[in-house]
Amino acid sequence: CVTTFFTGILPIILFAIETFLPNPGDYSFIRHGVAGNLTSKWWMTNENITENGMYGQKGILFNEAIWGAFKGTLIVAVCCALLAGTIGLLVGYCVSKNRRSKWAAYVNNMAFLPYLMPSLAVGVAFFVFGSSMGIFNTYLLLVLAGTVKYIPFASRSALSSMMQLSGEIEEAAIIQDIPWHKRMLNIIIPIQKSSIISGYLLPFITCVRDLTLFMLLC
């Protein structure tokens, strides 16, 4: 518990307090015991002013650049999560159903390959690709790069969940002549929904906090 507090909770608390300090790193209010030294200017300033260390920027809640970046990040993260999660789910399903096939092993290894590549290398590769295809500095290129990079997270999660599922359940549905899409939507996904949801959340969370992959593409 002590380790968790000092490595996970305390940094977040200090980071939150930092946003209310009049000057970065000025913790004099603790020494003097005067909370009035704190300020909300970094949050609530709604005009472009240069004094008080604002450098011509509005506060966080009124800063169009920050909200625009936040919106763009969510768009890219959601699209990457949906695409990578769906592709990973299909890869995991196919590999689990053909686990003795050499092609299944090949597909499984190829799906895991982007995880072994540094994010900067993937970013450079898509930088060259996007420049040659005329899609540089577009959402399309960001989503393509993110999807390829984060497929391993989704495919491993899906494969793990599919390997835990008994084959007899789907075999019973096949005997009753239930189509594949209904077997997936009504049987497989509901049973393994927690693992499948994590296969979508992992790409989303990783995409939100990843800078190295996208810094060359924007």
Each language-model region and where it sits:
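Short alpha-helical segment that forms part of, or immediately flanks, the ligand-binding pocket
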Residues: E170-E171
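Membrane-water interface segments at the C-terminal ends of transmembrane alpha-helices
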Residues: V2-P24, W42-M54, G59-M163, I187-L211, ...
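Solvent-exposed soluble domains appended to multi-pass membrane proteins
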Residues: R183-M184
